[in-house]
Amino acid sequence: MMQITEKYLPFGNWQTYCRIVGEATDRAPLLLLHGGPGSSHNYFEVLDQVAEKSGRQVIMYDQLGCGNSSIPDDQAETAYTAQTWVKELENVREQLGLDQIHLLGQSWGGMLALIYLCDYQPEGVKSLILSSTLASAKLWSQELHRLIKYLPKGEQAAIKEAETTGNYDSLAYQAANAHFMDQHAIKLTPDLPEPVLRKKKGGSLAYLTGWGPNEYTPIGNLHGYEYTDRLKDLHLPALITSGTDDLCTPLVAKSMYDNLPNARWELFAGCGHMPFVQENAKYQELLSDWLISQD
């Protein structure tokens, strides 16, 4: 049985919950950044075996605003920003003494990784894994609106009405959005691993404040996120992973692949937003081999 260590790291007046898989080795740990904002580390537990397979610690944490970390919803406008989440990431590295890391960001976590690398130029990041993520909020929204056109006409109309009026409470909209997310994120069925189905704590206000009411209407404080042209300056090895049916469409993934000087892209057939869940064994093997090759 692998060793699991749980810690609460002080972060200003708050605390960050951290979960460490395995014992320290001479290989750089893998640090995981979850999506959302506000999704919590839970689903990353399906990658625990990567610690053993690749001979290193795998470290995950709940970002401020969700999970077992502090949830300062009363300070949402100042707490739930890219700047604060980057400071938290820096604090996690500092508190745990993570001089050398491999960094994996899934969905919003990939945005956080790119903001961190482009704007803060940190040292000691050996490689980057961009899991179903994006370099442009605008392209992401455009692509998802293209996918919405494949929904039944009534569902398209419900989504359009919600976006036009700003009222996302109607049952018709909620049903349409749920259908869209079943198709392109992941359909939650009882046979999925427990960490994926586990009810997450908090996170909804972090999501609304940072991103917006849904995946395709980025009206939160990250709405201007645009890093496509900055990718050319990132020379570290980068592995992009995505699914054919992903919210991260092949065009979104290709826009990152084309602009990163040292990138590899693995496209998972038949997968949505979580190939690491839907093709777990294949994903673990890919990730472990990548980490070993980049040590």
UniProtKB/Swiss-Prot annotation:
- The protein's superkingdom reads Bacteria
Active site per the UniProt annotation = S107, D246, H273
Activity regulation information from UniProt: Inhibited strongly by 3,4-dichloroisocoumarin, bestatin and heavy metal ions. Inactivated by p-chloromercuribenzoate, but reactivated by dithiothreitol.
- Any keyword Lipoprotein? no
Task: Look up the EC number in the record and give it.
Answer: 3.4.11.5
Temperature-activity profile:
Stable at temperatures below 40 degrees Celsius.
Q: Which UniProt keywords apply?
A: Aminopeptidase, Hydrolase, Protease
Please give the annotated consequence of changing G35D.
Answer: 0.1% of wild-type activity
The UniProt-reported impact of E143K is: Loss of activity
Task: Relay the pH-dependence remark from the record.
Answer: Optimum pH is 6-7.
Upon changing H273Q, the result is: Loss of activity
List each copy of the AB hydrolase-1 domain by range. Answer: 29-279
Effect seen on changing G109 to S/D: Loss of activity
Subcellular localization: Cell envelope
User: How changing P37L affects the protein?
Assistant: Loss of activity
The UniProt entry, under Pfam families, shows: Abhydrolase_1
Enzyme class, top EC level, equals hydrolase
The effect of G65D is: Loss of activity
The answer, when asked if Protease is one of the entry's keywords, is yes
Quaternary structure note: Homotrimer.
Give the family, as the similarity comment puts it. Answer: Belongs to the peptidase S33 family.
Q: What does this protein do?
A: Releases the N-terminal proline from various substrates. Has a high specificity towards di- or tripeptides with proline at the NH(2)-terminal position, but is not able to hydrolyze longer peptides, or peptides with hydroxyproline at the NH(2)-end. Partially hydrolyzes also peptides with alanine, glycine and leucine at the NH(2)-terminal position.
What protein name applies here?
Proline iminopeptidase
Organism of this sequence: Lactobacillus delbrueckii subsp. bulgaricus
Question: Which gene carries the instructions for this protein?
Answer: pepIP
